Amino acid sequence: MDQFIVSALKNRPKSFEEVIGQDSITHTLKNSLKTNQLPQALLFSGPRGVGKTSCARILAKQINNLESKNSEDFSFNIFELDAASNNSVEDIRKINEQVRIPPQIGKYKVYIIDEAHMLSNYAFNAFLKTLEEPPKHIIFILATTEKNKVLPTIPVSYTHLRAHETVL
């Protein structure tokens, strides 16, 4: 069955060391983990296919693993929303309800919102209070190819990391 996996998925980086061409981002994220200075909200922006979502997933897996050797221990604390196809107010309301519940094991629940620019304005507005004042046990990671389409009020409180194209 492995022979039928799309190359992009099969070769997706699983650690920061495997990410190609985003040294400043991976360095920043590794330092944040090492010093336990994690922002509660991150916005990754940049062109399609440069590693934004991969970096988000790697970070999400490592956040709760600081004391654990097994990277699968806390994978149930990671939630991913593809905003390209789940961009309604109802989708966001579900997240708003879920974030109130702290993780049963581990310190954080991590929400990755991929293609964040695809959220409707109504969905962004429904999400705004949660994004501006997330519970202490929540980390949000938004990834977008079109930062200019993300509501201007959101990036103010976010740590913004720009990914760039790499020529190999």
Place the predicted regions along the sequence by residue:
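Pre-Walker A (pre-P-loop) alpha-helix and adjacent loop at the N terminus of AAA/AAA+ ATPase modules
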Residues: Q3-A41, E97-Q98, P102
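Walker A/P-loop
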Residues: K34-T35, P39-D73
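Short glycine-rich substrate-engagement loop in P-loop NTPases that contacts/grips substrate
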Residues: A83-P103
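Conserved catalytic/switch belt of AAA+ P-loop NTPases
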Residues: I101, N125-L142
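Walker B catalytic acidic pair
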Residues: D114-E115
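Conserved D-loop-proximal element of ABC-family nucleotide-binding domains
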Residues: N121-Y122, P152
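Short regulatory helix/loop adjacent to the ATP-binding pocket of P-loop NTPases
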Residues: K129, K147-S157
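Single conserved hydrophobic/aromatic residue that forms the stacking wall/gate
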Residues: H160-A163, V167-L168
